[in-house]
Amino acid sequence: MKIRFSYRDISKNFKNSTSDSLEIRHAFEIIDATEQIRKSYGQYLLSSLDSDFYENRFNDLDILIKKIESVEKREIKDYILHSGGFTQYISRYSVVFEHAIFGVCPHWPLWACPLSHYKIAVEAARDFFAMPESLDTEVIVELPESDMAQIALFPPIMIEREESLDLKHD
């Protein structure tokens, strides 16, 4: 499974666009994965990179990478990132995404991915945003398949929060 960071020409989406004008926008996509994985990673992980870290304007991705490394080194137990798109609960093993506006609901259930996948995606997004905005710019990173089994609906950090979220499971 891989993530592709690139730019696309969106000029054709504008009615007043002339044939020689070029309007580009970044695009993130999951490739070499099943439809279910593409959908879930796209809906949560890639959406969070797009909505919460647009262009790394204030070095937000650099700051986040330092927090992730602090969690990995056990300098801090976990880190909660409150942002516009998602609240992200970062622990040593996984990152849980909760929609910042809708919370936990049928359209936006909690979702988690391995910390390794999250860190790779965040580092790649930072590197991508540092590159020139061009249709030739592309970054592709591979997410380790061996970590897929760690994806869980209720990782340890969520069990602690389950009562406050009024979640029920068997």
Summary of predicted features, one role per range:
Residues D9-N13, T18-P106:
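Acidic (Asp/Glu-rich) sequence patches and key acidic residues
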Residues F5-S6:
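Long protein-protein interaction modules used by eukaryotic assembly/scaffold proteins
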Residues E98-D170:
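Acidic, proline/glycine-rich low-complexity IDRs
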